[in-house]
Amino acid sequence: MIQITLPDSSKRDYSGPVTVAEVAASIGTGLAKAALGGKVDGKLVDTSFLISQDSALSIVTAKDAEGLELIRHSAAHLLAYAVKELFPEAQVTIGPVIENGFFYDFSYKRPFTPEDLVAIEKRMAELVAKDEPVTRRVLPRDEAVAYFKSLGEYYKAEIIASIPANEDVSLYREGKFEDLCRGPHVPSTGKLKFFKLMKVAGAYWRGDHHNEMLQRIYGTAWATKDELQQYLTMLEEADKRDHRKLGKELDLFHIDDHSPGLVFWHPKGWTVWQGVEQYMRKVYQNNGYQEVKGPQLLDKTLWEKTGHWDKYRDNMFTTESEKRDFALKPMNCPGHILIFKQGIKSYRDLPLRYGEFGQCHRNEPTGGLHGIMRVRGFTQDDGHIFCTEEQILKECVDYTTLLQKVYTDFGFKNIIYKVATRPEARIGSDESWDKAEHALIESLRASGCEFEISPGEGAFYGPKIEYTLKDAIGRQWQCGTIQVDFSMPERLDAEYVGEDGARHRPVMLHRAIVGSLERFIGILIEEHAGALPTWLAPEQVSVLTITDSQAEYARGVAKTLQNQGLRVNLDLRNEKITYKIREHSLQKLPFILVVGDKEMAAGAVSVRARGNKDLGVMSLEAFAERIASDIAQKA
């Protein structure tokens, strides 16, 4: 007798071993039809999995997160099946699930074309319509290697050969196609109705640039037609908001082949940068931070002490001078400890808060670079707080409150909070971890935040809070963080004199609110679709003349506004006013002021707000008050 416990705690008895599919069928035909897999004692399995002992079982359907994972995993194999049908000489390699979809890498004699993608997608739909069952079998490793070699699938054979010899491997078959996979999979191809192939890109075999360049086909798959359409619509909107496209259209920045992964800021883009930096500088000044500046080039021995040399060496730019090895800093924290160590520090000095707009460099692979959001050189609003364990709670509460205000000012209202707790491998006593985790959790509770716990996802040297922004089209961007660090003060011998007169190690809190300024500006551009709020816009007002006769008056208007600290563009060109209005509107300016003879005679301006809103004629003084109010309110 086998007893199955269901999620509602009800129990069902079966006379002998039973599959997940059979349990689903015994509950109801609707559930049997919807079943994609099961979770047996917490482990995700196929519907064909045989349960041979008393177990807890939940049936997984397309409504579950695990169900969507199964759909995407199986869709990757369906893609490989279709490619092998159409291009028999192609060799299959790997095909994992990724965020919102999947990909599969192929080796083929020529690049796949957009027309090929259309044909592959069509064949996938045909295979779905056939509703072919997906079956699993297990082979000894060496037998599996020989099997795939006999098929001419040498990449797959190489993967299997790297598995320990005493391990069996599982294969999944659908129709004529069989692939190596741990599984689980959906029960049949008919469960994979809602998918779309997105693009083809290059990818090196095993991620090594010394190996062959493969072709990676990306796709997306969803549980319903509506979800697929919503995702495709979101992608269309994201494309319109793409910061790389808007950066060019609005003349903000460019990336040049002469310096891959580094940003050339144009005058307007640098104005935005300065707006963000000066705002964050005031945040430092108003919240007890002392701004510091450390060198970019630091001796290798420092990075060896901190542990970065062992873990991040491949991502560091290095150089040699006078028989000494140096590295461009990938992060600012060691430099801040060196500043902290200058002079004796007392418990009365704590908490001591340092802030820096620190320029860092990381040798990111070319394929991972993405506009100004993923670069090799970036500047962080990097702060470090040196404090005692007892001070962690208050510092975290204050930091969260500050972060919320900053994000609100930049137009972000939706923040997701996560606490990453101790991993298995860690340093420090359990007592210290207890205090640190308690402080982080209580700081969020005190701030009125709902939050998630991410067990085991803290760093080996301390727990952290991650602050993730949700943007206008539902995408998530992890920006802010506050990280407790017990390790680095120990490694670099940072000390303070306690109230007892003895030497003590400070706790170090790593914190950043916007993180990389480059990335944050990219997020801002996409969040606002290029129409940055008035206080941050590179040009806040354009003054346009209708004819040459208003030129002198327009200059006076522009000068008056500039004297009030506004960023003003003056357009005196002898062009049609409709043309000029359209041109400046495309630059997404907050306000356009048109001056003709009537406005000049009245000492006024005709005001157009962004979005083609005609605010009518108003005095220059009234307009100045209006825009000043918008700026003050961060509108």
From Swiss-Prot:
The UniProt record gives the binding positions of Zn(2+) as 333, 384, 510
Spell out the Pfam families in the cross-references.
Answer: HGTP_anticodon, TGS, tRNA-synt_2b, tRNA_SAD
Q: Which organism is it from?
A: Polaromonas naphthalenivorans (strain CJ2)
Q: Gene name on record?
A: thrS
Q: Where are the transmembrane segments?
A: none
Question: What is one term from the GO cellular component aspect held by the record?
Answer: cytoplasm
Enzyme class label: ligase
Q: Which reaction does it catalyse?
A: tRNA(Thr) + L-threonine + ATP = L-threonyl-tRNA(Thr) + AMP + diphosphate + H(+)
Q: How does it assemble?
A: Homodimer.
* EC number, UniProt record: 6.1.1.3
- Cellular compartment(s): Cytoplasm
List the cofactors.
Answer: Zn(2+)
Known SUPFAM superfamilies for this protein?
A: Class II aaRS ABD-related, Class II aaRS and biotin synthetases, TGS-like, ThrRS/AlaRS common domain
The protein's GO terms of the molecular function aspect are: ATP binding; metal ion binding; threonine-tRNA ligase activity; tRNA binding
What does the sequence similarity comment in the record state about its family?
Belongs to the class-II aminoacyl-tRNA synthetase family.
Give the region (Catalytic) as residue ranges: 242-533
Q: How is the cofactor bound?
A: Binds 1 zinc ion per subunit.
Q: What is this protein called?
A: Threonine--tRNA ligase
